[in-house]
Design a protein with these regions (language model features):
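A detector of single, family-specific signature residues
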Residues: 1-156
Length: 156
């Protein structure tokens, strides 16, 4: 089994990978340019578990992990930070911390919606936004018509 601690950022990620069968530890930084991330994770054989800290720019990564059928655990940022005695942030150290918490079975996993649930939420949020926009336009047009003394029947 391969266990990966990952410190994910917008342009790159630092990883610490442990192969539990060989005991080999590998540390690496992956740029998010081209297909470097996809190539790296698709090259991993056997069962793989990846641990990342929750952040705003992680949806693409979760989709990639789901596509590659890799188990990805998302951790609570404050609880991950509380597990580290040193308060100094460092990408390499953060990746090693995530790896250590995964190995010790202390990784503070949070609940994440499934892809279907995320899609439904996005659809509902977008629909709500369009309905509000339509209402705003209707109200504006009504105000313009009333300001110009235009009425059509008793309704307006």
């Amino acid at each position: 089994m391969k266990i990966v601690g990952c410190d994910l950022h917008a342009r790159q990620q630092s990883i610490a990978l442990l192969d539990t069968e060989t005991g080999e530890l590998m540390e690496r930084t992956l740029d998010h340019e081209a297909d470097q991330v996809r190539e790296f994770y698709s090259s991993l054989t056997g069962p793989v578990v990846v641990g990342i800290e929750a952040s705003g720019a992680m949806q693409w990564f979760l989709q990639l992990m789901e596509e590659l059928e890799i188990e990805c655990r998302v951790g609570h940022p404050a609880k991950i930070r509380a597990a580290e005695t040193r308060k100094q942030k460092h990408d390499r150290r953060d990746a090693l911390l995530a790896l250590r918490l995964l190995l010790e079975k202390r990784f503070p996993t949070i609940w994440m919606p499934t892809t279907e649930q995320r899609d439904v939420r996005t659809l509902l949020r977008d629909r709500h936004q369009w309905v509000r926009m339509r209402t705003r336009v209707q109200s504006t047009l009504q105000a313009i018509a009333l300001n110009h003394g235009l009425r059509k029947g008793k309704a307006l």
